[in-house]
Design a protein with these regions (language model features):
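Conserved PLP-enzyme active-site core in the AAT-like
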Residues: 1-144, 231-232, 259
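Short low-complexity stretches enriched in small and charged residues
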Residues: 4-8, 76-77, 176-179, 218-222
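A generic, residue-level signal for flexible/boundary positions that often mark functional hotspots
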Residues: 27, 104, 172-175, 204
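A broad detector of the eukaryotic-type serine/threonine protein kinase catalytic domain
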Residues: 54, 107, 111, 176-183, ...
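Short, functionally important structural connectors and interaction interfaces within domains
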Residues: 81, 102, 126, 153-156, ...
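Non-catalytic terminal extensions of PLP-dependent enzymes
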Residues: 92, 142-164, 171, 178-324
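FAD-binding core of FAD-dependent oxidoreductases
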Residues: 118-120, 163-168
Length: 324
């Protein structure tokens, strides 16, 4: 499986769990899949490529049709990680870009909590030519609009799988969200998210390092502070944000940049909230120059200060008392 170097780690991990070898394709200077680097990787041993579009840098892969043609020509499939469907809802169909299989991240695009206190749910969709391989049973619609259950399926079906419906409550929330917005309003989600992201990006590019200056979609990535002479890191900026009442954004991801700060405002934030965030980020950038220690020792107002996050991740304590 070919995976871009900008991809989320779950992409190569998922393929590896299935026993596939991971081959990485590089990004070009614009942060997009380098088509020339991709071409030598394509042969009859390739099962396919996993991509997100827009990609993890928030950039639309403009060469996606060419990439699809190249991968299909050697017998491979295109798998779409639906993490970034937010700016495309109601405007672009992944199948029209050439994708054969996709999953939708309901917590990223369709307003559901991240699992809702239980397992997550990621609906999987396939192009028509892969329908015979879907698991059974299947709920189908007859010509008269009635529904029926097909228990056996085609000879190529992968058969029955346990928990095939995932977390039903999460699916129901996503379905409710879609019905509530309706066809017209769901098309407004993307433009609002894109507008908010670009507004923040352009407002902060004189304070934070912007490695790729092109128009982004719903998210973008800074590479730390523009002036890094004081030694203030992305982690320091994230911790200081907590003192001002803002949840810290994703940091140190994607791995293409050493001091990555990923900012994704979504479509729901008001201009007042965006302006408040911009003001605080500019203030933090000034603090980094004039009082760097205030960032290096942040946060100052939270119940706990800096945790040993490495130990917490590797040796988690999941109970408040020892039950042994």
């Amino acid at each position: 499986i070919i995976v871009p170097d900008s991809a989320h780690g779950t992409n190569p991990a998922s393929a590896a769990v299935c026993g596939l070898e991971i081959v990485q394709v590089k990004s070009n200077a614009m942060g997009l899949v380098d088509v020339e680097d991709l071409k030598p990787l394509l042969d009859d041993t390739i099962a396919g490529i996993m991509m997100t579009n827009p990609n993890t840098l928030g950039l639309f892969e403009k060469d996606i049709k060419e990439i699809a043609a190249l991968v299909h020509a050697c017998g491979g499939l295109l798998y779409y990680d639906g993490a970034n469907m937010n700016p495309l809802m109601g405007m672009v169909r992944p199948g029209d870009m050439g994708f054969d299989v996709l999953h939708l991240n309901l917590h990223k695009t369709f307003s559901t909590p991240h699992g809702g206190g239980g397992p997550g749910a990621g609906p999987v969709g396939v192009a028509q030519h892969l329908v015979p391989y879907l698991p059974v049973p299947k709920v189908l619609e007859d010509v008269d609009g009635s529904l029926y259950v097909e228990g056996s399926g085609a000879d190529d079906t992968c058969g029955r799988i346990s928990g095939f419906m995932g977390n039903f409550a999460v699916l129901l929330r996503a379905y409710t969200y879609i019905l509530t917005l309706g066809k017209q309003n769901i098309r407004m989600v993307g433009p609002l998210a894109v507008l908010g992201a670009n507004y923040i990006k352009e407002s902060l590019k004189d304070s934070f390092k912007l490695p790729i200056a092109s128009v982004c979609k719903h998210e973008f990535v800074f590479d730390g502070l523009l002036d890094q002479s004081t030694g203030v890191t992305t982690l320091d900026v994230a911790k200081r944000l907590l003192d001002y009442g803002f949840h810290a954004p994703t940091i140190y991801f994607p791995l293409l940049f050493h001091q990555a700060i990923m900012i994704e405002p979504t479509e729901t934030e008001s201009k007042e909230t965006l302006d408040g965030f911009i003001e605080i980020m500019k203030h933090i950038a000034e603090e980094a120059l004039n009082d760097p220690e205030s960032l290096k020792t942040a946060p100052h107002t939270t119940p706990v200060r800096r945790l040993d996050e490495t130990t917490a991740a590797r040796q988690p304590v999941l109970r408040y008392r020892d039950l042994a």
